[in-house]
Amino acid sequence: MLAVRAWGRTYNTLVQRKLNAACPTGALPAVTLRPLHCSLVARSPEQSLKDSKTFDPTLLQFLVCPLSRKSLRYEESTNELINDELGIAYPIVDGIPNMIPQDARMIHKDRKPESPDTEQTT
């Protein structure tokens, strides 16, 4: 037991020396810890495990499109996160959004705007 205490003190001393060398002013770098929302914590005991596979819409306040950095909206009927500005939809698999741009699908067809110069008169 004494060996464990001695090792603990030695380890703490080594860590403190390393921190002092890394931050000579004594100020440690600020680290911000933000808890992430976990739907399992908020689940009532009578809910089935099947519900854990659904997307939690409260996560939308933390998620943005990786391409445009704009907010997304959740489309429950298709189980996708939609970026209306770019016209793409990110799939949600087992309650986890797949935010890889290569896996997103286009939801708007390429529309060519009609200008008055190209209209034909009959």
From Swiss-Prot:
Protein name: Protein preY, mitochondrial
Gene (name only): pyurf
Further remark: PIGY is derived from the same bicistronic transcript that encodes these 2 different proteins.
Keyword Zinc-finger attributed: no
Main localisation: mitochondrion
Domain of life: Eukaryota
Boundaries of the annotated transit peptide in chain numbering: 1-40
Any one Gene Ontology BP term: protein stabilization
Keyword field: Mitochondrion, Transit peptide
UniProt keyword annotation of Transmembrane helix present: no
Cellular compartment(s): Mitochondrion
Function of the molecule: In mitochondria, S-adenosylmethionine-dependent methyltransferase chaperone that supports both coenzyme Q biosynthesis and NADH:ubiquinone oxidoreductase complex (complex I, MT-ND1) assembly.
Listed Gene3D superfamilies: 2.20.25.10
Family affiliation: Belongs to the PREY family.
Domain TRM112: residue ranges: 56-102
Cellular component aspect of the GO annotation: mitochondrion
